[in-house]
UniProtKB/Swiss-Prot annotation:
Residues annotated as signal peptide: none
Family to which the UniProt record says this protein belongs: Belongs to the TRAFAC class translation factor GTPase superfamily. Classic translation factor GTPase family. EF-G/EF-2 subfamily.
GO cellular component: cytoplasm
Name of protein: Elongation factor G
Residues given in the record as GTP binding sites: 17-24, 81-85, 135-138
Subcellular location: Cytoplasm
GO molecular-function terms, A-Z: GTP binding; GTPase activity; translation elongation factor activity
Function (record text): Catalyzes the GTP-dependent ribosomal translocation step during translation elongation. During this step, the ribosome changes from the pre-translocational (PRE) to the post-translocational (POST) state as the newly formed A-site-bound peptidyl-tRNA and P-site-bound deacylated tRNA move to the P and E sites, respectively. Catalyzes the coordinated movement of the two tRNA molecules, the mRNA and conformational changes in the ribosome.
Gene from which this protein is expressed: fusA
Any GO BP: ribosome disassembly
SMART domains recorded: EFG_C (SM00838), EFG_IV (SM00889)
Keyword field: Cytoplasm, Elongation factor, GTP-binding, Nucleotide-binding, Protein biosynthesis
Domain annotation tr-type G: ranges: 8-283
Length: 690
């Protein structure tokens, strides 16, 4: 996105929240009030411009992050609207990685919901400054003050209340601005475009003064001059107060909290003011660190400047039917023009940039260049994938990559005809390039193609996109749980691979210690060979053999995780040894280890949060117990109960129908991956073997 003006007038922000909190509705109002579009697109009508995919329009949810640009008070705002459903949390992860700030939207009735916690932790991981917007204040049961308390209790954040709601439920008409100490009332017949300032309602003066005092007391703590003035009893001016709030937001000392109703067109303009006043510009972000592509131990500092060497991070790949592959990038330094050649330092090859595009959802506008602080889409890149660094060929640097969560569900898919076979291969390769959380592999025993994803909805969307966008007709199996395996005992194995077929043979001997690791550790390989028992050129073959065979597991063909393999001895033959021989020896040692290391099956455990009316609580808890679940917490929530439980994923298929049935459609739930746990010995796992 081409810069216009200096970087201090630029904001790169994301809109994030739990599903149905009103993220896309808020974004649509932002685009309307900033003049980006001349009509308001409603999500429930399938007309939201940011939800452009057919699946998004049909379901009324955001599936893929969409980028756009608008202007407010002379400031350029690059916005990424992210999904709220847990199955698409990868879209949030890669967006937050490249953003300077975020607006967290909360449902004024439900408060801080499970996915709100997930995206908040993601923002914590990348140190993204935030503003909170408590939405849906016009809804019956909306409670601004409870939401503020939940921001403390569930997110561990320090809320800085900047507004108070005027009126409740359908009587919500505006807000008290605690910074300027005035009221803001919106005119109903102007679609929220017109509003007026006034005095604070007399009945709210005492409360407003109390919250204003808290606001000033908290804000001045980040500025020595302001703190000194405050302690001396001097008034803090509005400009100084805003300066303190901005410094505190950028330093992650607190999070401003505003409120409104995006659907009823109230509260959006002050939210835009807060984005401009308090969220950081690219200039406010500390120097970005990377490592040298030539020497990974050498740390390199990248300063945000148009005059520096070009450095950008590819955070999203999208296939456009008219343009082909589009690579979304955040530029951290330098500038780039069309028809340029850049270095993909992550993969070690150059890429030719064809066109540079400014995006508004799925609409494109050609621009001549992109500069530091901008977000843009590049056409023409062939091999660049999510997380790759693009840079000047004379400045080979690699930025920190992104980590994506483990896939927990899989299904088998087969083309219905030979003609569909080739189309399916092409479709899956493109979808995998777009989506880092989608994994595709072929089962060696059955020959079936297996898709692995984040949940039922994720896989359902993938299959639907194959059919609609690529014309692939395929038979789809029922979703299956993605089990894992691990070992519970240490085992020392000596294995000799020896084969003589005339001429040069094969010989490799390895001594490997296999040990269990704590949950979440993954796989570790350590080479402790000394005195040249195995030449160093054969070590990669051993590690590669273990990397490959661990994916086939021991018990039922599921990947083995959370273990360490230590190579401590071995032998080689001057003529018959080779990297392949040692790879085969490592695989043989792994198979021999199976009978000694007490392998067990692991299953994904989900954190399930259920909100149910009090009268159905007994039935819901009884059902949780029948699913091998464990209730960990219960909280009161507006004449309802919030139940948090940990339940095996294998027991959750069809739960949405069962919950509706037992609660007459009044209960709802959210589900998130928590961890892997050992499958109890008394539990029979049906059809678990691949």
């Amino acid at each position: 996105m081409s810069s216009k003006g200096d970087l201090s007038k630029c904001r790169n922000i994301g809109i994030m929240a739990h599903i149905d909190a009103g993220k896309t509705t808020t974004t649509e109002r932002i685009l309307f009030y900033t003049g980006k579009q001349n009509r308001i697109g409603e999500v429930h009508e399938g007309a939201a411009s940011m939800d452009w995919m057919e699946q998004e329009k049909e379901r009324g949810i955001t599936i893929t992050s969409a980028a756009t640009t608008c202007f407010w008070n002379g400031c350029r705002i690059n916005i990424i609207d992210t999904p709220g459903h847990v199955d698409f949390t990868v879209e949030v992860e890669r967006s937050l990685r490249v953003l300077d700030g975020a607006v967290a939207v909360f449902d004024g009735v439900a408060g801080v919901e499970p996915q709100s916690e997930t995206v908040w932790r993601q923002a914590d991981r990348y140190d993204v400054p935030r503003i909170c917007f408590v939405n849906k204040m016009d809804r019956v049961g909306a409670d601004f003050y409870t939401c503020v308390d939940m921001i403390v209790d569930r997110l561990g954040a320090v809320p800085l209340v900047l507004q108070l709601p005027i009126g409740v439920d359908k009587g919500f008409v505006g807000v008290v601005d605690l910074v300027e100490m005035r009221s803001i009332i919106w005119e109903e017949d102007s679609l929220g475009a017109k509003f007026h300032y006034g005095d604070i309602p007399e009945g709210m003066l005492e409360e407003a003064n109390k919250y204003r005092s808290k606001l000033v007391e908290t804000a001045v703590e980040v500025d020595d001059e302001a703190m000194s003035m405050y302690l001396d009893g001097q008034d803090i001016s509005v400009s100084l107060l805003k300066k303190c709030i901005r410094a505190g937001v950028i330093g992650s000392n607190f999070v401003p909290v505003l409120c409104g109703s995006a659907f009823k067109n109230k509260g959006v303009q002050p939210l835009l003011d807060a984005v401009v006043d308090y969220l950081p510009s690219p200039n406010d972000i500390p120097t970005i660190e990377g490592v040298s592509a030539k020497d990974p131990d050498q740390v390199m500092q990248i300063t945000t400047s148009e005059d520096g060497k070009f450095v950008a991070l590819a955070f999203k790949v999208m296939v456009d039917r008219f343009v082909g592959s589009l690579t979304f990038v955040r530029v951290y330094s330098g500038k780039l023009t069309g028809k340029s050649v850049v270095l993909n330092s992550s993969k070690g090859h150059t890429e030719s940039v064809g066109r540079i595009l400014l995006m508004h959802a799925n609409n494109r506008e050609d621009i001549s260049e992109v500069k530091a602080g901008d977000i843009a889409a590049l056409a023409g890149l062939k091999k660049t994938t999510t997380g790759d660094t693009l840079c000047d060929q004379n400045f080979p640097v690699i930025l920190e990559k992104m980590d994506f969560p483990e896939s927990v569900m899989e299904l088998a898919i087969e083309p219905v005809s030979t003609a569909d076979q080739e189309k399916m291969g092409m479709a899956l390769s493109r979808l995998v390039a777009e989506d880092p959380s989608l994994k595709v592999f072929v089962n060696n025993e059955s020959g079936q193609t297996i898709l692995k994803g984040m949940g039922e909805l994720h896989l359902e969307i993938i299959v639907d996109r194959m059919r609609r966008e690529f014309g692939v007709e395929a038979s789809v199996g029922a979703p299956q749980v993605a089990y894992r395996e691990t070992i519970t005992k240490a085992a020392e194995v000596e294995y000799i691979h020896k084969k003589q077929t005339g001429g040069a043979g094969q010989f490799a001997k390895v001594n490997i210690l296999f040990e269990p690791l704590p949950p979440g550790s993954g796989f570790e390989f350590e080479n402790k060979i000394t005195c040249g028992a195995i030449p160093k050129e054969y070590i990669p073959g051993i590690q590669n053999g273990l990397e490959l065979i661990k994916e086939t597991g021991i018990i039922a063909g599921f990947p083995l995780i959370d273990f360490k393999a230590t190579l401590f001895d071995g032998a080689f033959h001057e003529v018959d040894s080779s990297p392949l021989a040692f790879e085969l020896a490592a695989k043989g040692a792994f198979r021999e280890m199976a009978s000694k290391a007490a392998p067990v099956l692991l299953e994904p455990i989900m954190r399930v949060e259920i909100i149910t009316p009090d009268e159905y609580m007994g039935d819901v808890i009884g059902d949780i117990n029948s699913r091998r679940g464990k209730v960990s917490e219960m909280q009161d929530r507006h004449n309802a109960k919030l139940i948090t439980a940990f339940i095996p994923l294998s027991s959750m298929f069809g739960y949405v129908k069962d919950l509706r049935s037992m609660s007459q459609g009044r209960a709802q739930y959210s589900m998130f991956f928590a961890r892997y746990e050992r499958v109890p010995e008394n539990v029979v796992v049906n059809d678990v073997k691949r």
